[in-house]
From Swiss-Prot:
SUPFAM superfamilies: PLP-dependent transferases. The gene is gcvPA. GO terms for biological process: glycine decarboxylation via glycine cleavage system; nucleoside metabolic process. It catalyses: N(6)-[(R)-lipoyl]-L-lysyl-[glycine-cleavage complex H protein] + glycine + H(+) = N(6)-[(R)-S(8)-aminomethyldihydrolipoyl]-L-lysyl-[glycine-cleavage complex H protein] + CO2. Coiled coil: none annotated. The glycine cleavage system catalyzes the degradation of glycine. The P protein binds the alpha-amino group of glycine through its pyridoxal phosphate cofactor; CO(2) is released and the remaining methylamine moiety is then transferred to the lipoamide cofactor of the H protein. The keyword Oxidoreductase applies. One of its GO terms (molecular function) is glycine dehydrogenase (decarboxylating) activity. Its EC number is 1.4.4.2. It holds the Pfam family GDC-P. The glycine cleavage system is composed of four proteins: P, T, L and H. In this organism, the P 'protein' is a heterodimer of two subunits. It comes from Anaeromyxobacter sp. (strain Fw109-5). This is Probable glycine dehydrogenase (decarboxylating) subunit 1. Belongs to the GcvP family. N-terminal subunit subfamily. Keywords: Oxidoreductase.
Length: 445
């Protein structure tokens, strides 16, 4: 409280209004033992130039010399400078949905374009105006499935992102719904026999990754067929959305719901977030979809306009009728993804996806020449798991060379046969052939 713009007279007037004798009165609810009895131990004041130099020096200690090979749900991709420049426009630079939305036609049109891109890439009929992130989108999909089917069991593949599954468990902890996790096989894909045994007449949804957390392209059509036979919904979860520029759309393979994140478009890694979640469905479920939808309409003068519709969140309708309590969504992050996709276009996205696929193959071949084999035989997109002997040691060793090597899988899958050596690494358009070769030789030691 030692530095603020108010004069002593201002402070005295405010204290008189609230009936306090001093500023200390405002903190009486905090026990004395928890209060700091001395000023903070801060360095001397510095001018702006000196301060920024110090901050840059501190930031440089965390910098790596090369693009990271770490993916595991958050991916290093090039963000065109035009994305950040357009985000800075005053009309857009807020994460908030306007409380008088029809006044903000530009924002609404951007959200409408987001929904269009989501539907095009997922093969679904309807998308909402974004979710918090991929994990909460998946959890909301499970809740929607229980409402649609009237059932209470969620069957999820162990190859789905482990942290997504933790969020799912948190959401369902108080609902009484059951979560059954089915294993993946030696090829990295969901074990279809185990899936078929787990799915029954009480199953509301089957959730599989597309691609999975392990980087492989999972058996989505077969999983969807098993779910459909039991009357359950199929939820496809995508964390690496660039894959949708190459793979068949989830909707074309039998998925009823497609969720995930578009972090790979227009959004830097930023220590894991923020990242826009997407949620797309078949039209028959539109009344049960969480969040809100931006729709196009025509006003009384025949002019095209945009409105928020089907806003079944508890801020807009009675709580007991709401499909979710989602508040401020990831609107600005969704706009970044929308701008990036618009800049890429259909052909550009396909080229980007093919390049990522090719770089993953290059990574596999380079590590193969170094005598390091992939853990799983199923085809990957741009991320692979390898047995490097001691993953934690490799990560620590390469970090000293300015290379972020990947994510040790033992953190999430200690039961893996070769868990100690399991390292999950990604290769994207940022990883040049020379860098991939350097990485392979560095891992080899």
């Amino acid at each position: 409280m030692r530095y603020h713009p108010h004069t002593p007279e201002d402070v005295r007037a405010m204290l008189d209004v609230i009936g306090a004798e001093s500023l200390d009165d405002l903190f009486r609810s905090i026990p004395e033992r928890l209060r700091l009895a001395r000023p903070l131990d801060l360095p001397p004041a510095a001018d702006e130039i000196t301060l920024f130099a110090e901050l840059r020096a501190l930031a440089a200690r965390d910098d790596t010399a090369h693009p990271p090979f770490v993916g595991a749900g958050c991916y290093p991709h090039h963000v065109p400078p035009a994305v950040d420049q357009l985000l800075l426009r005053g009309e857009f630079f807020t994460a908030y949905t306007p409380y008088q939305p029809e006044v903000s036609q530009g924002t609404l049109q951007a959200l409408f374009e987001w929904q269009t891109f989501v539907c095009l890439l997922t093969g679904m009929d309807v998308s909402n105006a974004s979710m918090y992130d991929g994990a909460t989108a998946m959890a909301e999909a499970a809740l929607m499935a229980t409402r649609v089917t009237g059932r209470s069991k969620i069957v999820v593949s162990a190859a789905v992102h482990p942290e997504y599954r933790k969020v799912l468990a948190t959401y369902l902890r108080s609902t009484g719904d059951e979560i059954v996790t089915v294993p993946f096989g030696a090829d990295g894909r969901t074990d279809l026999r185990a899936l078929e045994a787990a799915v029954d007449g009480g199953t509301a949804a089957v959730i599989v990754g597309y691609p999975s957390f392990l980087g492989v392209v999972d058996a989505l059509p077969q999983a969807a067929a098993i779910a459909k036979k039991a009357g359950a919904l199929t939820v496809a979860v995508t964390a690496e959305a660039v894959a949708l520029g190459l793979l068949q759309a989830p909707g074309a393979l039998g998925a009823d719901v497609a969720v995930g994140t578009f972090q790979s478009f227009g959004n830097p890694m930023s220590f894991g977030g923020p990242a826009p979640g997407f949620f797309a469905i078949r039209e028959q479920f539109v009344r049960q979809m969480p969040g809100r939808v931006c729709g196009a309409t025509v006003d009384k003068h025949g002019r095209r306009g945009f409105v928020l519709t089907l806003s079944t969140r508890e801020q807009h309708i009675r709580r007991e009728k709401a499909t979710s309590n989602i508040c401020t969504n990831s609107g600005l992050a969704a706009l970044a993804a929308t701008i990036h996709l618009a800049l890429l276009g259909k052909q550009g996205l396909a080229e980007l996806a093919r390049l990522n696929f090719a770089r993953a193959r290059m990574l596999k071949d380079a590590l193969g020449r170094a005598g390091i084999a992939p853990l799983f035989s199923a085809p990957p997109f741009n991320e692979l798991a390898f047995d490097v002997g001691d993953a934690e040691a490799v990560v620590a060793r390469l970090a000293k060379r300015g290379i972020a090597a990947g994510a040790p899988l033992a953190r999430w899958y200690p039961e893996l046969p070769r868990a100690k050596g399991a390292l999950l690494s990604v290769a994207t358009e940022l990883h040049t052939p020379e860098l991939i070769e350097l990485f392979a030789q560095s891992v080899k030691g």
